[in-house]
């Protein structure tokens, strides 16, 4: 085995230990109130201020049509302007979803306009900071405005559609 492959194997063994951790599995299962959950995606996402289209998902405020519990772990420090994940505040989000329900539009619409920036909050933090959130809340990937590059380990969990 090459040294490079050996390093990758050690890395994936570590991730396997993390994501097969009984406490993490129990947390996700309790959150969804079922044992029929899965990790549907694990990937690294790097963003910078050059060449990225920011007028499309995931850079627009939205909520996911499929419900996930997402884990976003910053692998680099994320300060203001570095593209931290951004959320609508609870009161505004609840009001928005009630309006969509009244119009019976919740299934069709998932991109929303936020004109009042006081109703959103960007999550910043040092590397290792984790944002864990239900995608029923309005959110977006933050736009990188600085010269830094945001690097995030993202893990999406959900109810396994094949078992539910």
Question: What does each model-identified segment do?
Answer:
Residues 1-61:
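Non-heme Fe(II)-dependent double-stranded beta-helix
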Residues 46, 73-77, 89:
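Short, structured patches in soluble enzyme cores that scaffold and shape functional sites
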Residues 58-66, 138-141:
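Histidine-centered catalytic micro-motifs
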Residues 60, 70-74, 120-122, 130-132, ...:
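Conserved hydrophobic/aromatic beta-strand scaffold that supports enzyme active sites
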Residues 64-80, 124-125, 156-158:
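Short, conserved beta-strand element in jelly-roll/cupin
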Residues 80-138, 162:
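Double-stranded beta-helix
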Residues 142-146:
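Short proline/glycine-enriched turn/loop segments at secondary-structure junctions
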Residues 147-163:
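A short hydrophobic beta-strand segment most commonly corresponding to one strand
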């Amino acid at each position: 085995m090459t040294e490079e492959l050996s390093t990758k194997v050690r890395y994936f063994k570590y991730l396997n230990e993390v994501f097969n951790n009984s406490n993490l599995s129990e947390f996700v299962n309790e959150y969804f109130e079922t044992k029929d959950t899965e990790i549907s995606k694990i990937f690294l996402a790097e963003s910078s201020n050059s060449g990225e289209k920011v007028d499309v998902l995931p850079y627009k405020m939205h909520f996911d049509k499929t419900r996930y519990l997402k884990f976003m772990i910053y692998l680099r420090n994320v300060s203001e302007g570095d593209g931290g994940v951004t959320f609508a505040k609870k009161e505004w989000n609840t009001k928005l979803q009630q309006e969509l329900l009244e119009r019976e539009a919740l299934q069709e619409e998932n991109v929303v306009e936020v004109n009042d920036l006081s109703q959103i909050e960007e999550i910043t933090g040092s590397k290792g900071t984790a944002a864990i959130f239900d995608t029923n809340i309005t959110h977006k990937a933050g736009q990188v405005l600085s010269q830094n590059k945001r690097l995030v380990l993202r893990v999406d969990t959900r109810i396994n559609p094949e078992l539910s």
